[in-house]
């Protein structure tokens, strides 16, 4: 189920994004990016609709994923 990120308190959203970024450990290439930069990137993806915040009832977890990969 998609959770509207706009309905979350700003601190809650930031904490969810930070947790996601720390879990993912994505390789950013030759130049490492700060945690703040990674969080800002994910927030922009949510704002643009490119990414969605998803609640998994099966696993009782929240995740962030590309919208095109989400299936209800």
From Swiss-Prot:
Family: Belongs to the UPF0270 family.
InterPro entries in UniProt: UPF0270, YehU-like_sf
Gene designation per UniProt: yheU
Cross-referenced HAMAP family: UPF0270 (MF_00690)
Name under which the protein is recorded: UPF0270 protein YheU
Organism expressing this protein natively: Salmonella dublin (strain CT_02021853)
